[in-house]
A protein has these predicted regions:
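Surface-exposed interaction patch
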Residues: 18-19, 28, 66-122
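Short, polar/proline-rich extracytoplasmic segments that appear immediately after membrane translocation
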Residues: 2-67, 170-172, 181-185
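C-terminal, structured domain-capping segment
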Residues: 71-88, 93, 135-185
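Polar low-complexity intrinsically disordered regions enriched in Ser/Thr and small residues
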Residues: 40, 52, 56, 73, ...
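Signature of Gram-negative chaperone-usher
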Residues: 1-12, 21-27, 51, 101-157
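Generic "edge-of-domain/loop-turn" microfeature
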Residues: 32, 42-44, 49-51, 68, ...
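Solvent-exposed, conformationally flexible loop/turn segments
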Residues: 39, 58-72, 130-132, 136-145
Length: 185
């Protein structure tokens, strides 16, 4: 009879120890979370801010024959050294605010943009609508800081005597934004 009680105690103890061990193993396995590819991994610095013009200080243009005479905004982007992923891919957008931007400047098709990756031109076009425009895509993002400059300017070659005063009194407000995805799977 004593042996039965001792065996019962040993069996119950083994069951309890196994239950605790299995529970601990399951908890430990599910508690390990490897965060990778989230926004914490990417460092995006809008050097001059995201806005090109603002409600209190809307951008006013002068006629120019190239982008260097226009307004600009700079973005510095890279992958943080502390991340477990090795690369990412970004897309840069130009978003026009219709509540402030003159329709004349858009319909005249004289407002242009130029995108530089460092000193290399990578995108250009005409801002002719108030929608979000994809101005640079498939941007490789690594731990090396990438400097991207966006210029907006009025192309003086496209302005006529008939619309010059109206265009020069026009206002533009927009901002740049970037969408980044992890390159690691």
């Amino acid at each position: 009879m004593k042996k039965k009680v001792i065996y019962s105690i040993i069996i119950v103890s083994v069951i309890i120890i196994l239950s605790v061990a299995v529970t601990y193993a399951v908890y430990t396995f599910s508690a390990v979370v490897n965060i990778s590819g989230t926004s914490e991994c990417f460092d995006v610095n809008y050097v001059k801010g995201q806005d090109i013009g603002s409600d209190s200080n809307p951008a006013k243009f002068v006629l120019a024959n190239n982008y260097t005479k226009g307004l600009s905004s700079v973005i510095k982007v890279n992958l943080k050294d502390t991340c477990t992923i090795t690369n990412g891919t970004g897309t840069l957008y130009l978003n026009t605010d219709t509540s402030v931007t003159s329709s004349t400047i858009l319909s005249g098709k004289v407002l242009k943009y130029q995108v530089l990756d460092g000193t290399t031109p990578v995108g250009s076009g005409i801002v002719s609508s108030a929608e979000s425009i994809e101005i640079y895509k498939d941007i490789p993002i690594t731990t090396t800081v990438k400097t991207i400059t966006v210029y907006i300017w009025l192309d003086g070659n496209l302005v006529t005597e008939q619309n010059q005063n109206e265009i020069l009194s026009s206002v533009y407000k927009g901002h740049i934004s970037m969408d980044i995805k992890s390159g690691d799977k």
